[in-house]
Amino acid sequence: MVVFVFAIMAGGFAYNVKVETTLARNAQDDHEFEWLARSGMEFSKWVLGQQMAIREETYDALNQFWAGRKFDTNDVFEGLSLQDIPIGRGHVTLEFTDVQSKFNINIANEEVLTTATELIGIDVGDAPIIVDSILDWIDRDDTPRDQGVEEDHYLEAESPYRCKNGPLDSLTELLLVNGVEPEMFWGTDPVDVQNMTRMERFRHRQANLPEYTNSFVKLFTTLGTKVNPNTCSSEVLQLFGIDPQLADQLVADRAGLDGVVGTEDDEVYRSNADFAARVGAGAQQLARLISVRSAVFQVKINTRIGERNRTKVAYIFRRNDKDIRVLFSFWE
């Protein structure tokens, strides 16, 4: 009996030691993950600065190093990679996204938002309610538009909250706006549904809801003031009132003769004037909202130590090739 008790005690002690060892190792790893992420952010800033310093390329496009292209020529990025960079005990992989490939919803007017509802596939009867409600959420007054709502509406909800009456800080604030459903926000493609919260996915499976092949999250951002025609989608170009066929062609032309984005034969728009010439009529109206040079980028910093992985997301603002700063960052 005594031997049995001691055996149990020894087993429990061994288990506790194993747990404490694992926790200690994880705590050490967490510290290293943070430094790996910081190293990744510093390298990201360097990459964006070096890209802007290339005098022959006064634009940002998807055939450049930051976007994943590998360089084999005598270039500042020669021999470098964004994939599996060894740092100490760990590795870092960087994935850049041009934030200005989307339209800033805080400067969107009724026409832009109406076009967005059409692209998303929102019912024509619901669209005016959503458009006016978004504009009422952003504007600073308490006077509702014809089909919009202001603070009184939100204070009467089961879980009351106030109307923002100011620009969105995060695009997810749209989920608080009258009429905006998670499916409209995320989209209903299988990949999009995975981005929903567990409750949103449950609701989506239970309800016979419309299919939205596009979404607010694919069209809009809350950062930057101009859209880069070298990195945006055809749908984003259509928000400017550009004909769908022309928008498709403008995007297809970027890929060059081989039809593959990110290769040497890409036909990028080297200046705003270059893009305006391709657009033709109505190009002057785009001038204040289009720029082939981007200032805000998102970078996903995928860190790995052994079998453990963590991802930090950082938003970086580039004023010039020397003044580059992290706006904010968070762990996914």
Residue ranges and their predicted role:
Residues M1-E332:
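Compositionally biased linear targeting/interaction segments
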